[in-house]
Structure formats: C-alpha cells, structure tokens
C-alpha cells in the first residue's frame, strides 16, 4: 500500500509546477477521451481526512457536468474514512494531474514524471514507463 506513497513539501516548486501543468493540460485529457484512446483513465486530486491532505489517484468510470466520477485507485494513508475502490466525484477544478495508461505508455502523469526525476534513474527505470504527450 504505502510503497507508492511519496511525500513532498507543499513548498516544493518543481512538484507544484507539475501539478499546475497537470491541471492546465486537462483539455488534452478530454481530447484523448473523446478520441477513444485505449487505456486506463485516472485523475489525481487532494483528499483530506483527519486534518491531513494527500494527493491520490481515482480511476474514471464516468463524467458529470464539470466533474469526474470514479473509484479511488489507491488506499488512502491519512485515515479510514475512505478506502481503495470507494466511489468519488471530483470537481474538475480540483484535479491536479491526469493519466491515460496503456501498458507501459502513459499520457500526462506530470507529477509522476517529477517524482521519477527526483529518484535515482535506475529506480525510475524499474517502472518501465514511457511518457507521451
């Protein structure tokens, strides 16, 4: 569960820039959905419980009016109110990042790209991901 959790300071400028890019490129995410690009569609958003905020992925199951609907793709670490697989609705304005993952190819994933840039190259290579735009 927690092996994929990476902690960043809220002051980390590179990660903040990655979140900003993820949010600002949401139109590309919508383009890929409209084109029927194969893969698993996920969005990342802040989830707060017990006074602590984590940034977590949700696998999409649908769209609403300005919202994404889906299932939590990870087990939250800051409490027990939510669990992996819980159905959530997230406002598009709250989305920090997005991914379309098909095998080892990933569109988006700007916060993941930053996390990989911050780790040793050998460790990042073990994930076998090729990022696309």
Short names for language-model regions:
Residues 1-57, 61-133:
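Mixed-charge, low-complexity intrinsically disordered regions
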């Amino acid at each position: 569960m927690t092996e994929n959790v990476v902690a960043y300071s809220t002051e980390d400028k590179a990660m903040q820039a990655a979140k900003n890019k993820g949010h600002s490129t949401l139109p590309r995410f919508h383009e890929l959905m409209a084109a029927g690009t194969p893969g698993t569609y996920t969005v990342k958003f802040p989830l707060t419980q017990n006074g602590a905020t984590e940034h977590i992925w949700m696998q999409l199951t649908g769209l609403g009016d300005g919202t994404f609907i889906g299932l939590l793709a990870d087990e939250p670490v800051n409490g027990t109110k939510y669990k992996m697989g819980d159905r959530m609705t997230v406002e598009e304005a709250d989305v920090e990042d997005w991914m379309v993952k098909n095998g080892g190819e990933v569109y988006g994933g700007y916060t993941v790209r930053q996390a990989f840039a911050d780790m040793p190259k050998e460790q990042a290579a073990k994930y076998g991901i090729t990022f696309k735009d």
